[in-house]
A protein has these predicted regions:
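Conserved donor-nucleotide binding/catalytic region of nucleotide-linked donor-dependent transferases
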Residues: 302, 307-339, 357-358
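Short amphipathic alpha-helix
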Residues: 14-25, 38
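Acidic donor-binding loop of glycosyltransferase active sites
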Residues: 88-90, 251-266, 273-274
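Active-site-proximal region of nucleotide-activated glycan assembly enzymes
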Residues: 3, 30, 38, 109-170
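Donor-nucleotide binding loops and adjacent catalytic segments primarily
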Residues: 23, 34, 40-48, 166-170, ...
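Conserved nucleotide-sugar phosphate-binding/catalytic loop shared by glycosyltransferases and other
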Residues: 6-9, 27-71, 186, 305-307
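An amphipathic, basic-hydrophobic alpha-helix
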Residues: 61-90, 108
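C-terminal alpha-helical cap of glycosyltransferases
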Residues: 340-358
């Protein structure tokens, strides 16, 4: 039986696709999972046993550069012996600097490397190892910064969604709650803007339109502060910290205001939840903007840059959307058409074929 190691770490945007890939492969191949300490907090170790290889970000802090460099070399040694001990046949990397030691060692040990790029901009580590990879799993042929000479390495699939999502109940495209239920997702990083600005938007909206809020908040203290504000003026609310199983909240959501991580926005499209994307402006290579722009160009969402966000303008837009629902329902129908071919079995068969044919 072929052995696959899936390497991940860092933010939820790297980890969630990794555990989905693990679920796709575990029945047909001997499958292993590695992460760094940051990524480990997003993983249920009981369901997804993983080995921790902690990789420091060498370029982040010049003061502790020598120490980080030493840790980096330690992670290379650890990666080398792990790959050799497990006799891995394929390394599947979800990108990020935490993948560097394993990819380097896989190259040395002549282990086949498969990369995964869910974003519309080629990540830096993926770009570095593209030359040495067998294939790169993507959702589109039109990825920015992708070298033309390696276009033949792209392996296209429909967007990766967790298996539980396919079994979840999806509402009709013509349904809407009274009052409307809005989901606010700040992501696993850069959520402070959502805690402050979007909560002010919610309070302003409530002055003109009754609504119900489900909101991801960055920490417990802010949950208490926001909950108090919402309760004082009578806004029905459900506030929570980052949640790997956020899909359990999707079933009766009418609208979302969200960051533009690839996993999150593809899940919203699959559930036919119209959304306003506000990309995280500090995301590497501005990839969140291009993730959202790709869907915006297909008439699947609305898009505004964080530096262009004005509470009064966004409030006016949302109120008009609630009054004239034609555009709202049009988005839902477009989402339904876009997602109808995305099935677990279709993606699963393609991913298995990828391993068997390489």
């Amino acid at each position: 039986m072929k052995k696959i190691l899936i390497s991940t770490g860092g933010s939820g945007g790297h980890v969630i696709p990794a555990i989905t890939l693990y679920d796709h492969y575990k029945e047909n191949f001997e499958t292993f999972l590695t992460t760094d300490k940051r990524g480990h907090k997003y993983i249920n170790n009981k369901n997804y046993p993983c080995y921790i290889i902690n990789t420091p970000n060498v370029s982040k802090n010049i003061v502790i550069f020598p120490y980080n460099l030493l840790l980096f070399f330690t992670s290379i040694i650890k990666s080398f012996f792990y790959l050799r001990k497990k006799k891995i046949d394929f390394l599947l990397s979800t990108g990020g600097y935490m993948s560097l030691p394993l990819c380097l060692c896989a190259k040395l040990l002549k282990i086949k490397i498969i990369l995964f790029e869910p974003n519309m901009v080629l990540g830096r580590s993926n770009k570095f190892f593209l030359k040495y990879s067998s294939k790169i799993i993507c959702y589109s042929n039109d990825i920015r910064n992708f070298p033309l000479e390696y276009k033949n390495k792209i392996f296209l699939i429909k967007s990766l969604l967790r298996k539980q999502l396919y079994n979840a109940i999806k509402r009709s495209v013509n349904e809407i709650n009274k009052p409307p239920k809005i989901l606010i997702i700040g992501g696993s990083q850069g959520a402070n803007f959502f805690d402050e600005k979007i909560s002010k938007l919610v309070i302003e909206l409530f002055k003109d339109k009754k609504l119900s809020i489900i909101q991801q908040v960055s920490d417990k203290k802010k949950i208490e502060v926001l909950q108090s504000k919402y309760n004082q003026i009578g806004i029905d609310n459900d506030l929570f910290k980052f949640d790997n199983e956020i899909y359990k909240k999707y079933h009766d959501i009418d609208f979302a205001i969200t960051r533009s991580g690839a996993s999150t926005i593809m899940e919203l499209v699959f559930f036919k939840i119209p959304f306003l994307a506000i990309p995280f402006s500090k995301a590497k290579d501005n990839h969140q903007f291009y993730n959202a722009k790709n869907l915006y160009d297909k008439n699947l969402c609305w898009l505004i840059n964080q530096n262009e966000f004005r509470i009064d303008e966004v409030k006016k837009f949302l109120l008009s959307l609630m009054l004239n629902k034609d555009e709202f329902f049009s988005k839902k129908k477009n989402m339904e058409k876009f997602s109808y071919q995305n099935t677990w079995n279709d993606v699963n068969q393609k991913l298995i074929r990828l391993i068997n044919e390489n």
